[in-house]
Amino acid sequence: MSEQHNIPPLDDWRRQGQEKYLKGVKLVFRQYKPYRKEWDHDHCEFCGAKFSQNEGDLNEGYSTEDGYRWICSECFNDFKEEFSWQVEE
């Protein structure tokens, strides 16, 4: 029996227009690294979870190829079908 994944409803609180800039993009699963040296953290583009190199924060997840935008694993799994993401190994 295959597991069917449900796409989050249109009124899901995490939806904030991300389809304008994240639909169909290539993502890379990797350890968190700040986009700029003066930055110490980033947030999930959907739920706002904190990514950093500090204990207690998310230390890995999916990012755009340039490392600018980050998506936590939970939100990635919830939105991957709808957003048609391609994951680079």
Model-based region annotation:
Residues 1-34:
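N-terminal alpha-helical interaction blocks
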Residues 5-6, 32, 63-64, 76-78:
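Intrinsically disordered, low-complexity regions enriched in Ser/Pro/Gly/Gln/His and often acidic
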Residues 25-43, 62-66:
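Short, flexible, mixed-charge glycine/proline-rich loop motifs
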Residues 42, 57, 88-89:
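Short glycine-rich, low-complexity/disordered patches
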Residues 44-48, 72-75:
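Short cysteine-rich clusters marking metal-coordination/redox-active sites
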Residues 54-59, 82-84:
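Short Cys/His-rich "knuckle" micro-motifs
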Residues 67-89:
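Short metal-binding segments enriched for Cys and/or His
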